[in-house]
């Protein structure tokens, strides 16, 4: 149920202070594209989610880019016994209610593009907990309310439908597939206008180092390209495109 349907107003909320995490802080300063390239080069596999994983609550007061450690929940088509609101969202509610400030919720809904995994009420809770953002392999609804809260949500679709009676969560804090990428609890999620990248926690330091190197290389290329009014020599000199 949308919060507005109950007659309550809503407003942007101030998130609690986030404990220091030097790895996360480093990824907050890198570009999403450089993190994607660093995953290719360091880990040797794709880290970026599918092209339709887009920011759905972008606007004033909503972070355009964020990074944080993943907490996860998995949702599948419901059985008749799972049709109640309590059971339908049990694990995603627990994911939010047990989250720490700065963490990123990752909700995987199997074949769930026409199902909203988060709306105004869950968004209110996520923002109150100080979550950095939420990533949904599926849909989101109540986008105006969630935007007004200041919560960044990336999802593959925007739909008005409830998950109740259709889908139910089956587990949380387990590895999930999210828009073509495996995400494990504690992995680093980096999200921005270019999309979303998941970085394995055990390779995060290496990936961050390479992403910083890529950013630094490109920052040197830009003035050279402007000076030469050409691209080829800069690409040859820096081996980067």
Enumerate the predicted regions with their spans.
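N-terminal export leaders
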Residues: 1-5
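Intrinsically disordered, low-complexity regions enriched in acidic/Ser/Thr/Pro/Gln residues
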Residues: 6-87, 92, 97, 217, ...
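General beta-strand structural signal in soluble alpha/beta enzymes
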Residues: 48-51, 75, 106-108, 116, ...
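Short coil/turn connectors at secondary-structure junctions
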Residues: 67-68, 100-103, 129-132, 148-151, ...
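Extracellular/luminal Protease-associated
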Residues: 95-137
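Ligand/cofactor pocket segment of small-molecule handling proteins
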Residues: 128, 132-160
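Acidic, glycine-rich flexible loop/linker segments
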Residues: 156-234
């Amino acid at each position: 149920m949308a919060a507005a349907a109950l007659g309550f107003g809503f407003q942007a909320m101030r998130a609690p202070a986030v404990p220091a995490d030097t790895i996360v802080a480093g990824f907050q300063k890198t570009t999403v594209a450089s993190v994607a390239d660093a995953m290719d080069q360091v880990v040797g596999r794709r880290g970026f989610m599918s092209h339709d994983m887009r920011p759905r609550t972008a606007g004033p007061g909503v972070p355009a880019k964020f990074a944080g450690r993943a907490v996860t929940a998995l949702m599948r088509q419901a059985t008749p016994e799972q049709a109640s609101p309590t059971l339908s969202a049990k694990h995603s509610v627990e994911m939010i209610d047990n989250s720490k400030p700065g963490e990123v919720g990752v909700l995987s809904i199997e074949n769930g593009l026409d199902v909203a995994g988060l709306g105004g009420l869950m968004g209110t809770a996520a923002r109150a907990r100080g979550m950095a953002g939420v990533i949904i392999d599926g849909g989101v609804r109540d986008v105006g309310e969630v935007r007004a809260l200041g919560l960044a949500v990336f999802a593959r679709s925007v739909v008005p439908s409830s998950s109740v009676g259709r889908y139910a969560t089956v587990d949380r804090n387990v590895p999930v597939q999210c828009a073509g990428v495996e995400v494990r609890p504690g992995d680093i999620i980096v999200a921005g206008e270019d999309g979303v990248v998941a970085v394995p926690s055990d390779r995060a330091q290496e990936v961050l180092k390479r992403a910083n190197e890529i950013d630094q290389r490109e920052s040197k290329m830009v003035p050279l390209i402007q000076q030469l009014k050409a691209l080829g020599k800069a690409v040859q000199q820096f081996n980067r495109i």
